[in-house]
Amino acid sequence: MVVSVRFFILCSFFSFIISSSIAHTSFRPKALVLPLTKDVSSSIPQYITKINQRTPLVPVKLTVDLGGGYLWVNCEDGYTSSTSKPARCGSAQCSLFGLYGCSGDKVCGRSATNTITGLSTYGDIHGDIVSVQSTNGNNPGRVVSVPNFLFICGSNSLQNGLASGVKGIAGLGKTKVSLPSQFSSAFSFKRKFAICLSSSTSTNGVIFFGDGPYNLNMDVSKVLTFTPLITNHVNTVSGFLGEPSVEYFIGVKSIRVSGKKVPLNNTLLSINQNGIGGTKISTVNPYTVLETTIYKAVADAFVKAVGAQTVAPVAPFGTCFATKDIGFSRMGPGVPSIDLVLQNKEVVWNIIGANSMVQLNDVICLGFVDAGSNPSTSKVGFVMGGLHPMTSITIGAHQLENNFLQFDLAASRLGFRSLFLEHTNCANFNFTSSA
């Protein structure tokens, strides 16, 4: 009986969100769109989006965390809104967050994490209006609103380390309260979202919530390759201890450099019973981080395939060349491809020169980081310094730039495509004209 009552309350809550959202708009959008800007003003590059929140509406800049579980916003820095409502202990709103605590005034809350710095603080759970643009996949459309969008109240200290003007973090992870889940519940569209990071600080990338088309001078949804998303049943990220991972993992079976298989300890490529190993995708790690033995094997194979002399490395990288020794083309630096082989040898994530290399004046480096020698680059998710990374391969943001990624949450699969292969890029969504 208790389970039935809780289920009824949960269903009623989702129905309330949906009906309330529709009440605030005269049509039901099939998809939403947000701009995504690369910001290098802080020590770690971040990818920033903007929503409108509160009453009256205020533009709020947020760092995007692909593997984040929720939205958190700094409530100490002038947060005022006539429509903000705390979530009461025992309510359906609280239960959506999984594990939570209750304060003396009967408001529920939980830990919020700054995944750039690793700092966590406890914050109350609130709901408030959020407004974003709809889209038909070709252009932005009408503004639509969710009147009771749930978030955690962060603090001034939690905001430290975020890019200039950013007030919180927008989580896109596998929870009931991430942005993709709340938007799809509010507007009853498909449980899909797509993200495309621009490599430039002067042009916008894009996030789509909902199904395609996704027009970036072509409908990218038509050219995607698919691979299953894998669940890691153990999560050691601060604020989620004891819960399954909310991050996105894929099954890398092997790595090739210039078409040749790199010898690896294959047990590192799978997730063990303690949640260690495997491959995840991250927008808060600026570069791909590899477990030490994987890094050394890949770097050695890469140097051999390039055939040029290495030079003194530039931190945080360990493998660098003189820029004059590397040619360039439309695909970026002319270096061998690094291929992540997925469920079979026909399904491959190709990492070409534009994504594998980082140019630093007269030096150009392999943009992969050794987790053992550079534990500080991992931020959260490393155990005992960095010699034992929780995840063997973390695909970082530089390797994601100008790659289109669609996350189909209902089917638990990832669609991906390098836009260099399609002669387009992530900055080609038309934000300037309306549908």
List PLM regions with ranges.
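Signature of the N-terminal lobe/flap region of pepsin-like aspartyl proteases
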Residues: S42-L162
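Solvent-exposed loop/turn segments at secondary-structure junctions
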Residues: G68-L71, G78, L158, V177, ...
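Aspartic protease catalytic domain
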Residues: V2-F7, S15-T25, D39, S43-P45, ...
